[in-house]
Amino acid sequence: MFYHISLEHEILLHPRYFGPNLLNTVKQKLFTEVEGTCTGKYGFVIAVTTIDNIGAGVIQPGRGFVLYPVKYKAIVFRPFKGEVVDAVVTQVNKVGLFTEIGPMSCFISRHSIPSEMEFDPNSNPPCYKTVDEDVVIQQDDEIRLKIVGTRVDKNDIFAIGSLMDDYLGLVS
């Protein structure tokens, strides 16, 4: 799920950037340090939308660096258990499917793939397919899955998915 939330970040700035473009430098550094990162609490920061406040800088004693507190709003992606999402298959093997849901990795065990779909190691590329070959899931295909669990680390989120519900599977 995508959310638009308020966040805070501290920017450490080297003295060589002090000058007429100081605030623009702080903004650019915020974009490069924050966008594309993941915090376990809020999820993946997709994009900074607005910068609400750049606080007064605090000089670091003995270093000359300045620490600027910045308050901003961003769009974040935070998946939850039970959510149905579209994903791209990145790897197919006998234990299951590995997929990517935007910046997040997701694994679908062969036990969470419908029983009428069998792994075919002899096809090129390897795939899961039905007996009548009506449905074939292989690398780079787009599938719809249900998230059945997530593991949140400090800088990453990993999900476990399933194709065992109605309307899940290959997106045509």
Swiss-Prot record:
Family annotation (SMART domains): S1
MF GO annotations: single-stranded DNA binding; single-stranded RNA binding; translation initiation factor binding
GO-annotated cellular components: nucleus; P-body; RNA polymerase II, core complex
Gene Ontology BP term (one): transcription by RNA polymerase II
Top-level taxonomic group: Eukaryota
Major place of residence: nucleus
Keywords of the record: DNA-directed RNA polymerase, Nucleus, Transcription
Subcellular location: Nucleus
InterPro entries, alphabetized: NA-bd_OB-fold (IPR012340), RNA_pol_Rpb7-like_N_sf (IPR036898), Rpb7-like (IPR045113), Rpb7-like_N (IPR005576), S1_domain (IPR003029)
CDD domains: RNAP_II_Rpb7_N, S1_RNAPII_Rpb7
A Pfam family matched in the record: SHS2_Rpb7-N
Subunit and partners: Component of the RNA polymerase II (Pol II) complex consisting of 12 subunits. RPB4 and RPB7 form a subcomplex that protrudes from the 10-subunit Pol II core complex.
Family membership: Belongs to the eukaryotic RPB7/RPC8 RNA polymerase subunit family.
Function as written in the Swiss-Prot or TrEMBL entry: DNA-dependent RNA polymerase catalyzes the transcription of DNA into RNA using the four ribonucleoside triphosphates as substrates. Component of RNA polymerase II which synthesizes mRNA precursors and many functional non-coding RNAs. Pol II is the central component of the basal RNA polymerase II transcription machinery. It is composed of mobile elements that move relative to each other. RPB7 is part of a subcomplex with RPB4 that binds to a pocket formed by RPB1, RPB2 and RPB6 at the base of the clamp element.
PANTHER family: DNA-DIRECTED RNA POLYMERASE II SUBUNIT RPB7, DNA-DIRECTED RNA POLYMERASE II, III
Name of the molecule in the record: DNA-directed RNA polymerase II subunit RPB7
Organism name: Danio rerio
Organismal lineage: Eukaryota, Metazoa, Chordata, Craniata, Vertebrata
